[in-house]
Each structure stands twice: as structure tokens, then as C-alpha cells.
């Protein structure tokens, strides 16, 4: 749709350049966007991050960190606990510490712009042991952490790891915390910015926020006024038979062409 909208201006003089960027690995590491930041380009005043927002301009979203907590114990026959060190026993304590940490984060941090107005910490997936009559020698827990704009991701990650280490102390097991991929930082831009206001007027939708992560932070780092906007719904994302409502296609093209005309034409 962006290409279709831009084609309208192929033979027209533009006072400001129009750039369409396609990035790699947007679903996980954001490697393409990180490379753009490292290379310092493209240079632009405004950026629209194409995401399924139902044509609603998004001025803020939460950060996303996915982490793995691993506990190494020692396996042995379950008939004699002294023969091993149970990794699941330690992980039980760690999970309790994470749940307490989640509550502390929610009590300290709120953002009125979000439907879920606190940071979230989800204990999403655990793998441990291999047999009920064997002391569990290894346990792995994967978690999803979503922080609000303004929160220091590095500081929270350090606090989380320290809570886990404290919970595991004295258990004769080894604990590590690692990231599945580099964290996606939170993003926030002025809700009354020029681009946000124009997209809001053209789409007849009030600016809002979302809890999923995007590349917006990285483009903003390059000095662009950045908005997340696009056709479709996140409800259909990551589902079998993803689809885009036909009713969104032409309005999206029309809106993009008006935005290009406003900011790029002489």
C-alpha cells in the first residue's frame, strides 16, 4: 500500500524526499532497524511505522523484553533427595520472587494512556525435568516483560536478575538470566504532534497507545517525529490465515497520499 500510494508522486516534483524503508527481522531482534540507527540513516523529519492499528494513529507503546531464567541443579534418584539438587525447588522460589517483583513494578509505575496502565511480567513457558522418579537437574522459565515509556529497561533487567539470584541463593544450584533477543525499548511521542494530528483527522480516529512493540523507538532515535499507523487489526496478527480488511485498503492509500502531499510536495 505504501508503494501504491507513493507511485502517485513518481512524476511529480517533491520539495522533500520520500523514503520507503523495508527492514529485516522486525518480529524479533529488530536487526534491520538497529542497523539503520548504527548507520545514521535515513534522514527525515517524519516517519510512519506501518503496523495493524485499525487506522488509529499510535503515539506510544510499551517496550518488550523476552528473557530466559535457567536453573542448573543435579539429577539423582528421587528416593534419596541427598543424591541431587532439585532445580524445580529453586525455580519455585524464583517464580515467587518474580511475581512479587511484578506487583512492585505495578505499584510504582502507571501510565494513564494505556488500557493496561502498568508494566506487565508474564511467566509464559517452563521446561523442567524428564521423569517423576528423578530429581530435576535442569529447569528453564521464559518470561515476557513489557515496560512503560519512561522506564529504564537496563535498570529493570538488572533488578529482575538480582531478585532471581537472591531467590536462588543457598540452594546449591546455578542460575542464569539471558535475553532471547535484544529488548525493544518503549516508545512515546507527543500526542499532539503534526503528523499524529493529521493522521487522526484523516482517519477520524483519536490517537492512542498499544502494548505491542514496534520499530518506532529506533526511527525516533534518528530524530524523526514518529507515529505508528496502518490498516488491519492486531487481533488477526500471528494467527492462522492472517488477513486485512478490504475496507481498510483504499482509505489507507488515500491517507498516505494526503500525508505525502502535505509534507513532501512544494
Description of each model-found segment:
Residues 1-4, 43, 90, 251:
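Residues within well-formed alpha-helices
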Amino acid at each position: 500500500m505504501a508503494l501504491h500510494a507513493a507511485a502517485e508522486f513518481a512524476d511529480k516534483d517533491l520539495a522533500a524526499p520520500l523514503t520507503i524503508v523495508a527492514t529485516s527481522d522486525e518480529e524479533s531482534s529488530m536487526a534491520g532497524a538497529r542497523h539503520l540507527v548504527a548507520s545514521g540513516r535515513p534522514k527525515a523529519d517524519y516517519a510512519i511505522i506501518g503496523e495493524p492499528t485499525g487506522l488509529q494513529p499510535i503515539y506510544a507503546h510499551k517496550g518488550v523484553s523476552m528473557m530466559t531464567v535457567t536453573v542448573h541443579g543435579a539429577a539423582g534418584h528421587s528416593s534419596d533427595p541427598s543424591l541431587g539438587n532439585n532445580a524445580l525447588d529453586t525455580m519455585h522460589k524464583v517464580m515467587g520472587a518474580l511475581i512479587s517483583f511484578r506487583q512492585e513494578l505495578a505499584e510504582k509505575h502507571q501510565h494513564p494512556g494505556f488500557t493496561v496502565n502498568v508494566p506487565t511480567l508474564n511467566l509464559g513457558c517452563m521446561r523442567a525435568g524428564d521423569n517423576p522418579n528423578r530429581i530435576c537437574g535442569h529447569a528453564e522459565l521464559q518470561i515476557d516483560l513489557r515496560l512503560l515509556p519512561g522506564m529504564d529497561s537496563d535498570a529493570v533487567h538488572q533488578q529482575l536478575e538480582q531478585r532471581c539470584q537472591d531467590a536462588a541463593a543457598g540452594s546449591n544450584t546455578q542460575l542464569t538470566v539471558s535475553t532471547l533477543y535484544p529488548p525493544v525499548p518503549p516508545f512515546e511521542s507527543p500526542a499532539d504532534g503534526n503528523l499524529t494530528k493529521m493522521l487522526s483527522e484523516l482517519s477520524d480516529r483519536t490517537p492512542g497507545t498499544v502494548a505491542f512493540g514496534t520499530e518506532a523507538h529506533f526511527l525516533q532515535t534518528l530524530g524523526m517525529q514518529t507515529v505508528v499507523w496502518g490498516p488491519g487489526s492486531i487481533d488477526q496478527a500471528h494467527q492462522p490465515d492472517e488477513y486485512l480488511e478490504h475496507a481498510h485498503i483504499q482509505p489507507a492509500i488515500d491517507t498516505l497520499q494526503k500525508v505525502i502531499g502535505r509534507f513532501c510536495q512544494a
